[in-house]
Amino acid sequence: MNAVILIPARLDSSRLPKKMLADLDGEPLIVRTWRQALLSNHAVRVVVATDSPEIAGALEAYGAEVMMTSPHARCGTERIAEAARSIDADVFLNLQGDEPLIDPRNIDLCLEPFLADNPPDCSTLVYPLLPEDFQQIDDPNVVKVVLDRNGNALYFSRSPVPFQREVYAATQFYRHIGLYAFSAEVLQHYASLPPSMLEKAESLEQLRLLENGFSIRCVTTTVDHPGVNTPEDLDLVRRMLRRSAGR
């Protein structure tokens, strides 16, 4: 397997403007994400795809490989698909730029289905939620996923799925961890498709795959980490970094 990690990064964010350049213990957030990606054992290359000269400059100051992409990408997967057209690889992993604490073991876990004889169209990670995690289950910023018996995604939603008529304890909920591995062919096919109805309704780009008949293999991980979507998330990550540094 010849796998390349592509990190899409844009400057504008409705919930947390310029979050990619937010300071995390002296480094931009996007640099932290790039450094974690370099620790993967399965990937041979890490590239950041951006349309922002400001983000590119911040990364290049640390020696990161950057590809400039069109400002017209409608989502991160379209952005990495553009970059992937000039890279020779079998598999591309889309790592969100706002994951500065991503564990490299999760990156490798997401890529492992592509080591099998019959690889999926796409793979991603899910983290099991407990009944006491009801705040996450109800939080629209936390994406939930329901699986079939073979571990393939049936649906992703910002709503609590599956709906419970009685109590949350009656079923298993999973939180989606937003990194994806694609075959090179499926990635380009994805980018050629228009945004789908459910994708636009939920604002979840992975639904474009499901609506068009592609499978998404979901691998369960026990290694959790917070992404950065809101100011509260950013404060949490800063506190975690201070604790890990003994401050």
Swiss-Prot record:
Q: Does the keyword Nucleotidyltransferase apply?
A: yes
Which pathway does the UniProt entry assign to this protein?
Nucleotide-sugar biosynthesis; CMP-3-deoxy-D-manno-octulosonate biosynthesis; CMP-3-deoxy-D-manno-octulosonate from 3-deoxy-D-manno-octulosonate and CTP: step 1/1; Bacterial outer membrane biogenesis; lipopolysaccharide biosynthesis
Which Pfam families has this protein been placed in?
CTP_transf_3
**Catalyzed chemical reaction(s):** 3-deoxy-alpha-D-manno-oct-2-ulosonate + CTP = CMP-3-deoxy-beta-D-manno-octulosonate + diphosphate
Does the keyword Transferase feature in the UniProt annotation?
yes
Instruction: Give the record's keywords alphabetically.
Output: Cytoplasm, Lipopolysaccharide biosynthesis, Nucleotidyltransferase, Transferase
Listed EC numbers: 2.7.7.38
* CDD domains recorded: CMP-KDO-Synthetase
The record's listing under InterPro entries reads: Cytidylyl_trans, KdsB, Nucleotide-diphossugar_trans
Primary location class: cytoplasm
Q: Which GO terms describe its cellular component?
A: cytosol
Query: Which function does this protein serve?
Result: Activates KDO (a required 8-carbon sugar) for incorporation into bacterial lipopolysaccharide in Gram-negative bacteria.
Q: Which family is this protein grouped under?
A: Belongs to the KdsB family.
What is the protein name given in its UniProt record?
3-deoxy-manno-octulosonate cytidylyltransferase
Source organism per UniProt: Chlorobium limicola (strain DSM 245 / NBRC 103803 / 6330)
As recorded in Swiss-Prot or TrEMBL, the protein's gene is named: kdsB
